[in-house]
Structure formats: structure tokens, C-alpha cells
Amino acid sequence: MNKIISNPPFHIISPLLFRLARKYFISDTFELCVLIVQLDYAKKMCAPPGEKRSRLSATIQYYADVELLSIVSRKNFFPPPEVDTAIVRLRPRRTKHMVDFSSYERTVRILFNMPNKTLRKVIKKYFKDRSPTILEQLVQRKINVRKHVRELSNMEIEIIADLLKEFLD
């Protein structure tokens, strides 16, 4: 399978996207995924680092280019749903990743449990006694530990994941 086009039930979108990322977006043969999702969800998927950034957007954008193609009004359906929808296209990124999916996903899960906290606070909470060593190494790698988690770019998260994989095993 190299293409997916679907209008999945809204309640399975998150698990579906994480499964697609884990199984297909890292494949050399997978080309394209087009989905109809809730408009708010589409906006989360496309969110740049900042206010709306989430575990979902950080993970999906790391493995795929996400593009909101079109907004579809609820009036176009019968019976009309309670929310507007959007058509989203995802194309796998063909870049070499520093870390495997599992390490990246574990790091994102830890970080985005507290998206409004600074990276420094998250590291201190999760890694307690080892946090001074980790924070020092992050600073050496030019990562601003005073930045809020939701403001981190995918490249910064990748650098953090690369460092944390030795502390998570």
C-alpha cells in the first residue's frame, strides 16, 4: 500500500495518525495520505511551534509534510455533522532522521505532558537526579532550556530525543 485516501470516523483519527506515522510515513514506498478530519483537528495537525502545538503536531510534522487543502462546510453533508471538516494531505518526509520513531515518540510524549512548562521544568520533573547532566548537555547542544515545550521545533525535539534515548533505556 502506498496511498491512503479516507474519511475515517472522527473518534479514531488520533490513533490512526499515530499508527500511520509509525508504520507508513517511515516507509520508503509510501507516497501520500489524504484524510477528511474535523477542522479544529486539521488546524492542530498543521500548527507551527507556538500556542496550538501538541504531541500530535510534533509527531506528524516530524514524519510528514502536512497541508490543509480545503475546508468543507458541515452544510455539504447530510445529515450535517456538528462541526466543519477539512481535507488534509500528508506526504512523508524523505529526510534522514537522527532517532528512531520509538525514541522520538517517547520524548514527545514526555515533553507534551506539560506543553506550557519550560523544557527545564519538564526535564527536572521526569529525570530528577539526572536532570543537571541532561540540562548541561542540552545547553551544550544549543537548546534553550527556558523555552516552553509547545515552542520547540521538530529539529530541537529531535536533538532532545537523541540525547534522552540513553537516559530512557
Residue positions per predicted region:
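Class I S-adenosyl-L-methionine
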Residues: 2-5, 12-149, 162-169
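Short helix-start
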Residues: 156
